[in-house]
UniProtKB/Swiss-Prot annotation:
EC number: 1.14.99.46
One Gene Ontology molecular-function label: alkanesulfonate monooxygenase activity
Reactions this protein catalyses: uracil + FMNH2 + NADH + O2 = (Z)-3-ureidoacrylate + FMN + NAD(+) + H2O + H(+); thymine + FMNH2 + NADH + O2 = (Z)-2-methylureidoacrylate + FMN + NAD(+) + H2O + H(+)
UniProt xrefs under HAMAP family: RutA (MF_01699)
Broadest EC class assigned to this enzyme: oxidoreductase
Protein's GO biological process: alkanesulfonate catabolic process; nitrogen utilization; uracil catabolic process
CDD domains on file: Alkanesulfonate_monoxygenase
Organism: Escherichia coli O26:H11 (strain 11368 / EHEC)
InterPro entries in the record: Luciferase-like_dom, Luciferase-like_sf, Pyrimidine_monooxygenase_RutA, SsuD_RutA_monooxygenase
Keywords: Flavoprotein, FMN, Monooxygenase, NADP, Oxidoreductase
Pfam families, per the entry: Bac_luciferase (PF00296)
Protein name (database record): Pyrimidine monooxygenase RutA
Name of the coding gene: rutA
Binding site for FMN: 49-50, 115, 124, 140-141, 190
Length: 363
């Protein structure tokens, strides 16, 4: 099973709590995180894109770097780890994304890929005057389908004459082309999102579910597997989890309860409000899971809370789910979290037993 890190491109990472570590996103922080992840044989690093935050006491995600420029910088200071940036497709024409991706492919030596998102938080785009109207909620995967067809044309042949409802290419050119086939990823959990991933993505991200229920996402992975079978493609699921670990289960649980006790209710209210804006995509979208009150303090990503041995065991359970090819991890404290993962958790994981021994060099 592959392991990735979801780098904190926005302030405070993924904990919406006054009791969680409070920090600003910087290149130096993310550089240290990704270099440490590479040292511990993580397979990939991904950054999201967020253009407006949730506010509240913690000013959650009000402060964000930009994904492509951040990952270009990280590509230049790493040598093995796969690097993924996220394109907010309403803000960037596909021909520009194609050229930026080809550039980072050159910087990274073929280690770059693109995560495509349609956009769900209306204020991100309204503030720039580019929200296409609420009908977009029901047509966003039609838009993304045209978008990725233009990308594939340009990366594959260097030229596109695509004509569609959303994009018109007239002998559009991109050169140089990427040195290796460019990987495209998506994070669809709705039926439309999974159908898109089944047709066009190399793999699909999904949320883990619950606290210490590592296989609860299995029905989602099964839906993705079934959708991919309809297209004759192999599209695995990569599952998002937060790791909160300590020497003992009780110590880890105490940290988790402390974070929940400091939940930033004002920021969480904003998230809930935004989740109700899309009345057209059904009930199975990512944002509806994010806003569920069960564990909203970390946007309801799957959460693994326990001793190092307990977390290792739960991650091995994740690996046992059919269709689960990887996990994307966040941590309550990224630098110490990656180090303890690499030193104390990963060596106990059966699904990572193939890794070579660590060098003595300090990450």
């Amino acid at each position: 099973m592959k392991i990735g890190v979801f780098v904190p491109i926005g302030n405070n990472g993924w904990l919406i709590s006054t009791h969680a570590p409070q920090y600003m996103p910087t290149f130096e922080l993310n550089k240290a995180i990704v270099q440490k992840a590479e040292h511990y044989h993580f397979d990939f690093a991904l950054s999201m894109i967020k253009l407006r935050g949730f506010g509240g006491k913690t000013e959650f995600w009000d402060h964000n770097l930009e994904s492509f420029t951040l990952m270009a910088g990280l590509a230049a200071v790493t040598s093995r780890i796969q690097i993924y940036a996220t394109a907010a497709t309403l803000t960037l024409p596909p021909a520009i994304v194609a050229r930026m991706a080809a550039t980072i492919d050159s910087i990274s030596g073929g280690r770059f890929g693109v995560n495509l998102v349609t956009g769900w938080q209306k204020p991100e785009y309204e503030q720039m005057g580019i929200w296409p109207g609420d009908d977009y909620f029901s047509r966003r995967y039609d838009y993304l389908t045209e978008y990725v067809q233009v990308l594939r044309d340009l990366w594959g042949t260097g030229k596109s004459d695509f004509k569609g409802d959303f994009f018109t290419m007239n002998d559009c050119r991109v050169s140089p082309q990427p040195s290796v086939p460019m990987k495209v990823i998506c994070a669809g959990q709705s039926d439309a999102g999974m159908a898109f991933s089944a047709q066009y993505a190399d793999f699909n991200f999904c949320f883990g579910k619950g606290v210490n229920t590592p296989t609860a996402f299995a029905p989602t992975a099964a839906r993705m597997k079934q959708a991919a079978e309809q297209t004759g493609r192999d599209v695995g699921s990569y599952v998002l989890f937060m790791v909160i670990a300590d020497e003992t289960d009780d110590a880890a649980r105490a940290k988790w309860e402390h974070y929940k006790a400091g939940a930033d209710e004002e920021a969480l209210s904003w998230l809930t409000e935004q989740s109700q804006k899309d009345t057209r995509s059904g009930t199975d979208t990512n944002v509806r899971q994010m806003a569920d009150p069960t564990s909203a303090v970390n946007i309801n990503m799957g959460t693994l809370v326990g001793s190092y041995a307990s977390v290792a065991r739960m991650l091995d359970e994740v690996a046992s789910v059919p269709g689960a090819e990887g996990v994307l991890l966040t941590f309550d404290d990224f630098l110490s979290g990656i180090e303890t993962f690499g030193e104390r958790i990963q060596p106990l994981m059966q699904c990572r037993a193939h890794l070579p021994a660590l060098t003595q060099e300090v990450a």
